[in-house]
From Swiss-Prot:
It comes from Oryctolagus cuniculus. It is a multi-pass membrane protein. Belongs to the complex I subunit 5 family. It is found in: Mitochondrion inner membrane. The lineage of its organism: Eukaryota, Metazoa, Chordata, Craniata, Vertebrata. This is NADH-ubiquinone oxidoreductase chain 5. It holds the Pfam family NADH5_C. Core subunit of the mitochondrial membrane respiratory chain NADH dehydrogenase (Complex I) which catalyzes electron transfer from NADH through the respiratory chain, using ubiquinone as an electron acceptor. Essential for the catalytic activity and assembly of complex I. Its EC number is 7.1.1.2. It is an enzyme of class 7 (translocase). The chain crosses the membrane at residues 3-23, 38-58, 87-107, 114-134, 138-158, 171-191, 201-221, 241-261, 273-293, 301-320, 325-347, 366-386, 409-429, 457-477, 482-502, 582-602. One of its GO terms (cellular component) is respiratory chain complex I. The keyword Glycosyltransferase does not apply. One of its GO terms (biological process) is mitochondrial electron transport, NADH to ubiquinone.
Length: 603
């Protein structure tokens, strides 16, 4: 082992130490969160060593030391793939998690189980790193399921609330659907290729059938909340804000996109799979951008922006630019984590108020948070020379110049424009204007835990894109020439979005809507998707099963089939054999009438 692999091992050991310490008395110490946060910061510093070595040498490494098991001829080893993707993603994930943990020490300080919370956050990070560095599908599946179960525990952290429990259950159920696809792909590779090692899969068969790729796409759809399996993502906002920040920036939701990036050697030879990914991503990015326009919960707006960016990453994979999608994952982590931390800062300061209509004027009372939120929103829209610009602009350029579906490109451009609209809406509602919150609320953002964490991410949101795009050489040939109007398309649609938002803001001061528009209802009710999937379909299933149980089974089997049939047979037999009908009441009545007639005649 050399310095490259040794420093990676040291980073992992440092991260595991607080987990081991949780089985001792240290876990009961009030300083445990500080230990966890410090461990992550040390792990980040050490993880820079292999990353810098990789940047200097561009030498990938695969570490495979421990033979796990052999099932017939299928050999499983614990192997780590230290390549372009894992070496670049690991320090970014550690840096973002370090900032989120420092923020959590301020945000969750009054929580009685804060030590357990930090332990869960750390386990969440470790499972994501297992997923990123895995060199075989089984190891990747362990990390995949790990982030799933940790997200369930963290989204449902405030388990006394019904909404939190429902959201956690929703997240795990939607991910179960995706996991079916992953398991089907595992089974196909085991049966047909007899291996789960990534290198062997890529070498053995490049012209692979669509079936395992469909399984992988289904898995990515569930984990990365693409259209159809997306409702769990906004619901996941019921968890604490640090959980939302970690979930949306560098863990969980990017795992699905990362899976497809890992398998790009198979996808690039299958145009059907690429077209499917492109269309799925384009629909997702537009639909979620439309939903974000009318939301009033600040965290849900940021959550829908995540889903929209995930759709953009899927579009990038669909046009066969996996390295560009990965670059967007890396740049997106910084400003998305910062947007959530700024939202958490505002929510905490306003006594857990999340409605942007009840905010306003925060640039006066919370200047630091307001500045960071503005930087994050501008980076999200792809403002030139902020972090988001370096990946988003390239994605739009690549989509413009690729032989792709024109509708997918138009949809992506509209969604990019809408990103600017809802980002500006947050700034207008939350930061500008007059305060709309109670005057008695005391606002104080002068806490080093809060300021330092947001400050680091703000610096990342400004400089990280420039550093990443300049340090890492592209693995494919970029477009050398391009007309000016195509080059400026991304900037043009973003500025158009800002202009629309400004105009809408001016109009909203004077316009009074008498009735709600159906388009507004469609956007505000999330396309009626949750209502249909979570209310109408379960109700129809329940009523159908109830009718089947009561009407079909009970009435047919326990009433008509046996008792009624037996009685009908007995009656038919008795009437056939006997001349008497057995009508006792009629006999008594005729006897009474004849008796009365006789008495009447005699008297």
């Amino acid at each position: 082992m050399n310095l490259f692999s040794t420093s990676v091992a040291v980073s992992i050991i440092i991260l595991v130490l607080p987990i081991v310490a949780s089985f001792t008395n240290i876990f009961n110490s009030p300083n445990y969160p500080h230990y966890v946060k410090t461990s992550v910061s040390y792990a980040f510093t050490i993880s820079l060593i292999p990353t810098l070595i990789f940047i200097a040498t561009s030498q990938e490494m695969m570490v495979s030391n421990w033979h796990w098991m052999t099932i017939h001829t299928l050999k499983l080893t614990t192997s780590f793939k230290l390549d372009y993707f894992s070496m670049l993603f690991t320090p970014i994930a550690l840096f973002v998690t370090w900032s989120i943990m420092e923020f959590s020490m301020w945000y969750m300080h009054s929580d009685p189980k804060i030590n357990q919370f930090f332990k869960y956050l750390l386990m969440f990070l470790i499972t994501m790193l297992i997923l990123v560095t895995a060199n075989n599908m089984f190891q990747l599946f362990i990390g995949w399921e790990g982030v799933g179960i940790m997200s369930f525990l963290l989204i449902g952290w405030w388990h006394g609330r019904t909404d939190a429990n429902t959201a956690a259950l929703q997240a795990i159920l939607y991910n179960r659907i995706g996991d079916i696809g992953f398991i089907m792909a595992l089974a196909w590779f085991a049966i047909n290729l007899n291996t789960w090692e990534l290198q062997q899969i890529f070498i053995l068969d490049n012209n692979i059938t669509i079936l395992p790729l469909m399984g992988l796409i289904l898995a990515a759809t569930g984990k990365s909340a693409q259209f159809g399996l997306h409702p769990w993502l906004p619901s996941a906002m019921e968890g604490p804000t640090p959980v939302s920040a970690l979930l949306h920036s560098s863990t969980m939701v990017v795992a699905g996109v990362f899976l497809l990036i890992r398998f790009y050697p198979l996808l690039e030879n299958n145009k059907t799979a690429q077209t499917l990914i492109l269309c799925l991503g384009a629909i997702t990015t537009l639909f979620t951008a439309l939903c974000a326009l009318t939301q009033n919960d600040i965290k849900k707006i940021v959550a829908f922006s995540t889903s929209s960016q995930l759709g953009l990453m899927m579009v990038t994979i669909g046009i066969n630019q996996p390295h560009l999608a990965f670059l967007h994952i890396c740049t997106h982590a910084f400003f998305k984590a910062m947007l959530f931390l700024c939202s958490g800062s505002i929510i905490h300061s306003l006594n857990d108020e999340q409605d942007i209509r009840k905010m306003g004027g925060l640039y006066k009372t919370m200047p630091f948070t307001a500045s960071a939120l503005t930087i994050g929103s501008l980076a999200l829209t792809g403002m030139p020379f902020l972090t988001g610009f370096y990946s988003k602009d390239l994605i739009i350029e690549s989509a413009n110049t690729s032989n792709t579906n024109a509708w997918a490109l138009i949809i992506t451009l509209i969604a990019t424009s809408l990103t600017a609209v809802y980002s500006t809406r947050i700034i207008f509602f939350a930061l500008l204007g007059q305060p709309r919150y109670p005057a008695l609320i005391v606002i104080n953002e002068n806490n080093p835990l809060l300021i330092n964490s947001i400050k680091r991410l703000a610096l990342g949101s400004i400089f990280a894109g420039f550093l990443i795009s300049n340090l890492i050489t592209p693995n494919n040939v970029p477009q050398m020439t391009m007309p000016l109007y195509m080059k400026m398309t991304a900037l043009f649609v973003t500025i158009m979005g800002f202009t629309i938002a400004m105009e809408l803001n001016q109009l909203s001061l004077s316009l009074k809507m008498t009735t709600q528009s159906p388009y507004f209802n469609f956007s505000n009710m999330l396309g009626f998707f949750p209502m249909t999937i979570h209310r109408i379909l379960p109700y129809l299933n329940l009523s159908a099963s109830q009718n089947m149980a009561t009407l079909l089974l009970d009435m047919t089997w326990t009433e008509k089939a046996i008792p009624k049939n037996i009685s009908d047979i007995q009656i038919f037999a008795s009437t056939s054999v006997s001349s008497q009908k057995g009508l006792i009441k009629l006999y008594f009545l005729s006897f009474l009438i004849s008796l009365l007639l006789v008495l009447f005649i005699l008297t």
